[in-house]
A protein has these predicted regions:
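Glycan-recognition surfaces
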Residues: 1-72
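Generic recognition of flexible, low-complexity loop/linker segments
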Residues: 47-48, 117-122, 181-182
């Protein structure tokens, strides 16, 4: 079951962010078998650049939204074959982000912090991991420092404190690391997304 939560989305950054802002506050209504629908993806449409397209897709995956492509998929093909250099195709086929979107727990992301143009949103996953997204809503590059133990303070996320640190999987670069904090420099209108797992 799904229900539209907003008017039709438009292929511009203002509309993407406005739609996100409404839906991130509706997290408690999403769950297994029922989803908020913030409308189709505008990835690859209009004047959205690659960072904005990646952020748009990241946010919809974090919101457990239905992923319905709104672009012309013929642009994904070159000489009758998938164009492996097509940046939009790379974005919408990111298997790590799709796995977050389609996680069987079905819970949507909750905004856990908002500071200096950075939204920090997180959602619990069925295996006990947490998907964590750092979203730069500002029109300039921002730096952020986030203590991962802060995730354990919100019962909604259900993650255990891990004194020895956390395993981090960057879902866009596919890089893996361990640590207790995230220090990131994020370009304007961009996201960084991690899958976080206690090392205990």
């Amino acid at each position: 079951n799904l229900w539209r939560t907003t008017p039709d989305i438009q292929a511009n950054w203002k509309s993407v962010v406005g739609t996100y802002e409404i839906n991130v506050n509706l997290f408690k209504y999403a769950g297994k078998g029922n989803w908020n629908d913030p409308d189709m993806l505008e990835v690859g449409n209009g004047k959205l650049d690659d960072n904005e397209n990646r952020a748009h897709f990241s946010l919809w995956c974090m919101l457990a939204a239905p992923l319905m492509l709104g672009n012309d998929i013929r642009s994904f093909v070159s000489n009758g074959m998938p164009d492996k250099d097509n940046e939009t195709l790379k974005i919408v086929t990111n298997k790590h982000m799709i796995a977050v979107d389609q996680d069987s727990l079905g819970k949507s992301a909750k905004r856990i912090k908002k500071e200096s143009g950075i939204d920090i949103i997180a959602r619990p996953l069925s295996n006990g991991d947490v998907a964590l997204c750092l979203f730069n809503t500002a029109s300039s590059t921002k730096s952020v420092n986030f203590k991962l133990d802060d995730l354990t303070k919100d019962p909604y996320l259900g993650i255990e404190e891990s004194p020895s640190g956390y395993e981090l999987h960057d879902l866009w670069t596919d890089e893996r690391s361990t640590g207790t904090t995230i220090n990131a420099t994020i370009p304007k209108h961009s996201t960084v997304v991690y899958r976080v797992k206690p090392t205990i």
